Structure formats: structure tokens, C-alpha cells
């Protein structure tokens, strides 16, 4: 499974050491407005919204309130990441929902929070699957998936939902999935 070209950028930005270093390096004066609304809509804490806003401000060199592809390239360079046009395009394409060629704060917040949530879910799924069995060829039943899910992930799923997940992971149309197939399916989400 090839890694998305923008993942390296988002992973580096979200790494606490990098974020703290960037925030200390550049003092941001402006405040984020509508913190409560944004925190509720994106299901994150106010502190996370403020942290993401500070990082956004660091990237917005010209103070326009948006991030351009050249500002993304500059940040990639500062993070020590390959600044190829393809990587910059991948970051812009994954974030610029409006299609105007710029990333505004809400688009940036949406991209960052979705990456954070996805990495949390993937870690939860890995833990969940390790509770079922370490044999990657073991077949998972819907009932096993429901039990393991409830023990590791912060939400519950029904047997019907578990069946749908297994069906999606099933690459051979058998009506069942191995742990390996399930992991592969989760990595492509």
C-alpha cells in the first residue's frame, strides 16, 4: 500500500516536538475566533484548535489568512521534508476543499483533525486485532469483532456493522475475512 505523499507533511506537523518548536520559534499574536464552535464541529478540545491555529499562523507567512502552495513548500523545507512539486500538490489537493488554490484555517483544521482521528482509529484497530489473535491468517467472526471492538475502541458496533466491515475486508468473496485482510482494508481507509 503506497503511503500518501501528504502524510509525511501532516505527520511531521502533528508531532508534538515539532509543533512546540515551531510555536516557540515564532510568537503568534492573533487569536483564533469561534474556538468553541470549531472545537464542537470538529470534536476536538479548544486547546487543540488553538494549537492548530498557531501552526496555521506560522505557515501563513504573508498574513493573508490562507496558506498557498509556496507557503506549504516553505514549511516542508523547514520540517526537512522533500519539497518536490508532487508532495506540495498532494498537500494542497488533500486540504483545499474549496478548490481556490489556498488553504484557509477551517480547511487546515479539518485536515489536521482528520489525520489525528485516523491515526487514533488505526492504533485502536491494531490493538483490537492483536486481542483477537496474532495469526494473520485467522478468520475473524463478526461476534469476535464486536467483542474485541468494544474492549478497545471508544465506541461499540453492532453485529450487522461488524458483518459489513468483514464483508468489505473480504477480498475473495467468502463472507469472512482474515486478520491480514482486515488490517489491509483498515490501512486503505
Curated annotation (Swiss-Prot):
SUPFAM superfamilies: EF-hand. Residues 47-82, 83-118, 120-155, 157-189 form the EF-hand domain. Gene3D superfamilies: EF-hand (1.10.238.10). It comes from the Eukaryota. PROSITE patterns: EF_HAND_1 (PS00018), EF_HAND_2 (PS50222). CDD domains: EFh. Ca(2+) 3 binds at residues 133, 135, 137, 144. Residues 31-54 form a coiled coil. This is Uncharacterized calcium-binding protein C50C3.5. The lineage of its organism: Eukaryota, Metazoa, Ecdysozoa, Nematoda, Chromadorea.
Amino acid at each position: 500500500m503506497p503511503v500518501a505523499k501528504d502524510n509525511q507533511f501532516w505527520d511531521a506537523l502533528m508531532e508534538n516536538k515539532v509543533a512546540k518548536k515551531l510555536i516557540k520559534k515564532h510568537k503568534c499574536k492573533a487569536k483564533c475566533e469561534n474556538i468553541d464552535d470549531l472545537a464542537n464541529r470538529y470534536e476536538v478540545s479548544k486547546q487543540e484548535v488553538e494549537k492548530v491555529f498557531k501552526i496555521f499562523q506560522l505557515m501563513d507567512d504573508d498574513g493573508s489568512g490562507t496558506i498557498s502552495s509556496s507557503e506549504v513548500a516553505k514549511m516542508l523545507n523547514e520540517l526537512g521534508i522533500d519539497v518536490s512539486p508532487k508532495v506540495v500538490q498532494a498537500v494542497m489537493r488533500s486540504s483545499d476543499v474549496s478548490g481556490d488554490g489556498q488553504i484557509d484555517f477551517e480547511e487546515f483544521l479539518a485536515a489536521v483533525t482528520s489525520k489525528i482521528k485516523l491515526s487514533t482509529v488505526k492504533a485502536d484497530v491494531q490493538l483490537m486485532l492483536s486481542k483477537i489473535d496474532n495469526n494473520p491468517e485467522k478468520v475473524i467472526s463478526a461476534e469476535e469483532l464486536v467483542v474485541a471492538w468494544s474492549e478497545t475502541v471508544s465506541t461499540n458496533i453492532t453485529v450487522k456493522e461488524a458483518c459489513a466491515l468483514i464483508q468489505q475486508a473480504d477480498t475473495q468473496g467468502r463472507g469472512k475475512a482474515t486478520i491480514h485482510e482486515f488490517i489491509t482494508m483498515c490501512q486503505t481507509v
